[in-house]
Amino acid sequence: MKLIVFAGGTLGHICPAVEIIKQIKNKYSNVYIIFVATEKDKNYQIIKNCISDEIKFLECYSIKSSIKKNIKNIKAYQELKKLIKSKQITSAIGFGGYISGIGIKAAQSLKLKTFIHEQNSIMGLSNKLVLKKVDNIYLSFPITKYKKTTVVGNPVYFKAENLKKNIYKERNKMLFISGTLGSKEINQLAVNLIRGKHLTNYDVTIITGKKYYQDVFKLLKNTNTKIYEFSNNLIEQISSSEVVISRAGSSSLFEIIGTNTLSIIIPSPNVTNNHQYHNALYFKNVGCIEMIEENDLSINNFLSKLNILINNKEEYYKSMRNFKIDNLIDKMIEEICQ
C-alpha cells in the first residue's frame, strides 16, 4: 500500500500530518509514504525529522494569486499527477495549505481514495475545494454541516496528553507564543508587561518568530527574560509552563488543552473566515481558556484575565481534564490504509 500526504504553509497543517505519518509507520511499517509540502517549508525541523519514505517540496500558491503564480500551481498539479502515477499511489490525505488542495485534486483526477483532515472550527479554502469528492472528512471540531465526517480531534492533542505525564510543570513559568509567523501584538504585549514590571513573579519565556526576534531581544536584553526566535520542542515548552499566552491556531490550542496548561488566548483577526476566533470561542465556552480579542488587548485587560485565571485555576484544570475527544485516530489510520 502506498500513501501520499499533503500539508504545507504553516506548522498548524504540518504538525498533525507528521504525527499521523509517525503513527501510520508505527502501526503499518510496510506502508510506503510520500510527504509533500511547499518549497517554503523546507527549513522546518519537524519536516527534516519526518519518518516518511520520501519528502517532496513543490512551489505553489493561493488560487487567488496572480496569473504567473497560478501557472506554477498548474505545473505543481501536473507534477503531482506524474508522481502519483509513477509511484503507483493508492490513497491520499490532505491536511490543509495550498499544496493540499492541489494534491488532493490531482489524486481525485486519478480516481484514488482521498481524505482530508480539517484542524480548524471553520473549513479552510483548500479543503472546501475538494471535500465533495473525498471518501471521508476528519474533523478536529464538531462541524455539523458537512456529510461524510468523523470527529477525530487534532492528532497533536493525544501526543500532548501523553506528554504531560512525563514533564514537570514549573510554577510561575509564563510562555508567550504567537504562531508560525510570529505576532507583533503578542510580542509588544510581552515587552510592555516586562518593562512595566507587571510580571516580576513570573519566569518569562518569549518565542517571538523570526521577524520579531531582534526587536524584542534589543528591548529586553537587560532583563532575565528567555527569548527565542523559534522552538523545536514547543509542546514540551507548553507542558512545562504554568501559563501560556498564545494565538488560537488549532494545534496550539489542542497542545495547551492536552497538556492541561492555563492559558490566555488572543486570536489573530488576520486569518481566513476569522477561524481563530471560533477555535478559541469553542474552548472558552467549555471553560478551558480565557480569551482576549485583539481589539480589546491592553495591559489592564490582560492583568484582569490573568487574575481570573490564577484565582480560579482549579476550575480551569477541571474543565481541561473533563474535555474529552474519543480517540478515533486509529480508526482514521485503518480507513486510510485499507
Residue ranges and their predicted role:
Residues 314-326:
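A short, well-ordered alpha-helix in the C-terminal region of glycosyltransferases
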Residues 286-314:
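C-terminal "capping" alpha-helix adjacent to the active site of nucleotide-linked donor transferases
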Residues 308, 325-338:
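C-terminal alpha-helical cap of glycosyltransferases
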Residues 64-91, 109:
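An amphipathic, basic-hydrophobic alpha-helix
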Residues 5-11, 26-72, 178, 292-295:
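Conserved nucleotide-sugar phosphate-binding/catalytic loop shared by glycosyltransferases and other
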Residues 35-36, 41-51, 161-243, 277-280, ...:
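Donor-nucleotide binding loops and adjacent catalytic segments primarily
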Residues 89-90, 239-254, 261-262:
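Acidic donor-binding loop of glycosyltransferase active sites
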Residues 2, 32, 108-163:
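Active-site-proximal region of nucleotide-activated glycan assembly enzymes
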